[in-house]
């Protein structure tokens, strides 16, 4: 019986092939597929907030709340990978592998990263404003309080605030950066496992476990935060400057390091070094 998954070496080659396709993709495809990728990740975030709204205030153990949150969130990346789209964090793995193997260029990578980041933001904002805020899904209690607490924790830059009668300390800039490295290490491993599998069930399992892990641990995903924090802005409690300065910048930088170095470069070095060709 034929194997339903690729070897690690063949998976690395397949990732380079994906990078080559992304290098050649028209700008219109990049824009549309990046928009839907941001929306898909936001769907996962919306589901997670709806599923866990009020659990902490009701006295549920913190670890169990995180497990439920992380258990439902992976639907977002399943949609991204299986339906097909352009996710900035996954591209942080693909494109450096393409560069190192000579199948992608630096300028093509910059275009891909900037385009996917910007339109991931547009897609996530659409879901946050239209499907989470205007619909009233996250504006009623207990979901509103949960959404605002999550946004403040991510965006207040180390400041303290009161949530459910308790003092909470938000993440500092450097904490977001380090957590973002761990996040995209796991996210890109999820993508890598999905590439390794040749069937939908295998891809789904390959995605679910690493994504559940990063969410439960509390790592920082820049595209997910393009949903979580703006919801808090729309409801009230966080500003746009706090969103960009205290989270988007460190989360973006950390996600690049986590995906490019700890997954892309490591697997290229392990399986593909010495087989590359030059590309301008």
Curated annotation (Swiss-Prot):
GO CC annotation terms, alphabetical: plasma membrane
Signal peptide boundaries: none
Membrane spanning stretches: 33-49, 67-83, 116-133, 177-195, 204-219, 253-272
Any one biological process term the GO annotation gives: nitrite transport
Membrane topology type: Multi-pass membrane protein
GO molecular function terms listed in the Swiss-Prot or TrEMBL record: formate transmembrane transporter activity; high-affinity secondary active nitrite transmembrane transporter activity
UniProt main location, coarse: membrane
Coiled coil: none
Keyword Protein transport: no
InterPro entries per UniProt: Aquaporin-like, For/NO2_transpt, For/NO2_transpt_CS
Family annotation (Gene3D superfamilies): Glycerol uptake facilitator protein
Keyword terms of this UniProt record: Cell membrane, Membrane, Transmembrane, Transmembrane helix, Transport
Keyword Transmembrane: yes
Record's subcellular location: Cell membrane
NCBIfam families according to UniProt: fnt (TIGR00790)
Task of the protein: May act as a formate transporter.
Protein family membership: Belongs to the FNT transporter (TC 1.A.16) family.
Record-given protein name: Probable formate transporter
Native source species: Methanobacterium formicicum
Lineage of the organism: Archaea, Methanobacteriati, Methanobacteriota, Methanomada group, Methanobacteria
